[in-house]
Amino acid sequence: MRKVNRIYRKIANQRLDSLHKKSTEIANQYGIVCVEDLDMKAIGNKGFGNGKATFDNGYGMFLNMLEYKLKERGKYFVKVGKWYPSSQICHCCGSVKKFDLKDRVYTCDCGYIGDRDHNAAINILTEGLRILQSL
């Protein structure tokens, strides 16, 4: 049993080290970081893959580390509301289209065609900057 505990402790320490290194790298590289305020509990319960694996990846811990490291450096960490339809808005023209989760390519009437996640990331950044300006 001690051997198993030692292995789990080693894995936890490696994960913690990895999260610290990546959050430090991002905090040093960027002045503003905008993220979607995801409800990880709901995602884990809905069973996108393995629920335990969703909690086990340390996403919440990573965001906490990133937030305090950015603030220590006088930089900005902005959370965009979980109900903001980032993947449904065309970042080029602003039109809104509903898609199924299985649809990975965003196609808009304005002619924009691109990866749905990339489009959502641009929208999260744009909304985060808007939120930051309103403070």
Language model: regions and residue ranges:
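Positively charged, helix-rich recognition surfaces that bind polyanionic ligands
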Residues: M1-L135
